Amino acid sequence: MNRIALAVAVTLALVGCSRSPEPADPASPAAAPAARTAPVALPAAPSDTATATPSFDCAKATSDAEKWVCTDEGLAALDRQLAARYKRAQTAPDEVDIAAEQRGWIKGRDACTRAVDPRQCLREAYQTRLVELTVSSGGVPASATGTYRCDDADKPLKVVFYNDIDPAAAIVTLGTDQAIVFPIESASGSRYGREGVAFWEHQGEATLDFYGTALRCTADR
């Protein structure tokens, strides 16, 4: 299986990168489709007492990240969802690769406790891994694919939208760099983002802020 790196950024620490296959281009038009909006931001402060039920035993939580998950039902729900999806992925022919990726992802998730907003970082880490496992499983059709001409002609922009998976997402490829982004409520056009990345498209015009690189782009016709 052809697998490519997907960037996962945090504010103060780099979350461990995972790998997933190059998504196939659907026959859909390039314009970004309507999508479900991203979840509301999680509460900012943790509790000292386990109040949620993730896939693991909170009494045996060893990392600070696991302890954060144990105090927030939203994160715990994502953890349960990821545990179920990872279990299904373990039946794949490249199970060894997936196990190694998961260990790397756990290290990245644990680094989220050093981020400015640990809960946002944890939420994005879980959502990103869910998308990676879903897309890498194969047979997941994209909602649409957009290709764009940007200010930096040396770095073509491609955005593949997956709005019928949970969580809904898009994979942004700028040159050889990639990031998974999530729908954000927008008054007009389609907006996706994550910490460090913001993509907005409306009627063939797009803007992208990719970890400090700001571009204006036009959709290919």
Which ranges hold each PLM region?
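Central antiparallel beta-sheet cores of small beta-barrel/beta-sandwich binding domains
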Residues: A168-G193
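Post-signal peptide N-terminal segment of mature Sec-exported envelope proteins
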Residues: D25-T53
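Short, exposed beta-strand-loop hairpins at the edges of beta-sheets
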Residues: L122, A198-R216
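Sec-dependent bacterial lipoprotein signal peptides
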Residues: M1-V15
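Tryptophan-anchored aromatic micro-motifs
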Residues: P141-P156, Y192
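Bacterial signal peptide processing site
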Residues: C17-S20
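Short, structured interface segments
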Residues: L122-G139
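Amphipathic, heptad-repeat alpha-helical segments
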Residues: D57, A65-V96
